[in-house]
Regions:
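Conserved structured catalytic cores and adjacent interaction surfaces
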Residues: 130, 144, 167
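Extracellular/lumenal glycan-associated surfaces
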Residues: 120
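Short secondary-structure transition/capping segments
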Residues: 143-144, 175-178
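A generic structural motif
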Residues: 66, 142-149
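Residue-level signal for beta-strand positions within conserved beta-sheet cores that form or flank
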Residues: 86, 142, 168
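N-terminal non-catalytic structural scaffold regions of very large proteins
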Residues: 1-115, 124, 131-136, 152-155, ...
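Cationic-aromatic interfacial patches
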Residues: 139
């Protein structure tokens, strides 16, 4: 993992995201190329860090197999303009009803009951199951991550919108790599 000239805090966040992404991808199973499982070598692009549920597409590379990108990845858009013939259809395995692990970053004012409020807001929407919660406090603020099982990106986005309405939370966003 390349952490370059990043601070210890930034390095910890990179490691935390990589751990999350590994769990989410392992839970989802292998990528399907042209609709079927295969022994084709592939890797996830670090530029956009796709996770299960993201619309994805593959880009054939030399020596690294197929790189899996989010369809909205700026780097992929640039690569496609150079050589569009290297694109290949890929998708996450599973069918409707499949649950994906998704991660959220939360920040806010530390107050009694805030963790309960976060958990209740999550489980009260479609009985969403929580995989893990990790919250750290510093003086009167907290920061942490929440991993949840969601059906799709719409499910995740609705959870984010619901959490943003909680008093005391001033940041709720999808867990992204840095």
């Amino acid at each position: 993992i390349d952490t370059g000239d990043k601070s210890v805090e930034e390095q910890e966040k990179i490691l935390e995201f990589d751990k999350f992404a590994d769990i989410a991808r392992k839970d989802a199973g292998g990528i399907l190329v042209d609709g079927k499982s295969s022994g084709i070598m592939y890797a996830y692009a670090k530029c956009c860090n796709p996770i299960p549920g993201d619309p994805v597409i593959g880009y054939i590379t030399v020596g690294e197999g197929i790189k899996i990108h989010r369809k909205t990845c700026n780097n992929l858009i640039n690569l496609t303009s150079i050589d569009p013939d290297k694109l290949v259809a890929v998708q996450w395995p599973g069918t409707d009803g499949t649950l994906f692990v998704a991660g959220l970053t939360v920040k806010g004012e530390d107050s009694p009951g805030i963790l309960n409020d976060i958990a209740h807001t999550i489980v009260s929407y479609r009985s969403t199951n929580i995989k893990s919660i990790n919250i750290n406090t510093n003086d009167s603020t907290f920061e942490g991550s929440v991993m949840v099982y969601v059906n799709n990106l719409e499910h995740l986005n609705i959870l984010i919108d619901r959490l943003k309405k909680l008093r005391g939370l001033y940041k709720v966003e999808r867990f992204e790599g840095t």
